[in-house]
């Protein structure tokens, strides 16, 4: 999901707005990491992603008056090969996920953020 209603949502900002927040001292980019996998017959496959995005959004909103913070859309293709036999699962290779996180971190720095918070909800 892409949250465009939150004031801390990167996806809802223009490029100049992102840069303005990122270039402030102490800026933080929060990247929620979830998964898309089976959770039995009773829960949605996006449970981990839904939960981590909610926690990240609420946390970032609570500190936004005191800290320059933005929140990316969640990364939803985690590392879950052990769930594949049950169906309802999309997984990445571990190295692919690791590379993606490194590239997100490099992009955060390139945009001017001082720090990065990878929030693992899986």
Where are these regions (language model features)?
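Short coil-to-beta-strand
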Residues: 24-33, 67-79
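Active-site and ligand/interface coordination hotspots across diverse enzymes
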Residues: 1-44
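Short helix-capping segments at alpha-helix termini
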Residues: 61-67
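Residue-level signal for alpha-helix termini/capping positions
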Residues: 23, 64, 109-110
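Glycine-rich loop at the start of a catalytic domain that most often binds anionic cofactors/ligands
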Residues: 42-50, 84-85
């Amino acid at each position: 999901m892409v949250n465009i209603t939150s004031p801390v949502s990167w996806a809802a900002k223009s490029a100049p707005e992102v840069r303005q927040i990122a270039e402030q001292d102490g800026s933080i980019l929060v990247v929620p990491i979830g998964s898309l996998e089976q959770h039995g017959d009773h829960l949605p496959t996006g449970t981990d992603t839904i939960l981590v995005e909610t926690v990240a959004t609420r946390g970032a909103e609570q500190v936004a008056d005191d800290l320059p913070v933005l929140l990316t859309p969640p990364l939803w293709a985690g590392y879950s090969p052990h769930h594949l036999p049950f169906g309802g699962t999309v997984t990445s290779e571990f190295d692919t996920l690791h590379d993606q996180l490194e590239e997100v971190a490099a992009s955060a720095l390139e945009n001017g953020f001082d720090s990065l918070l990878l929030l693992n909800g899986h």
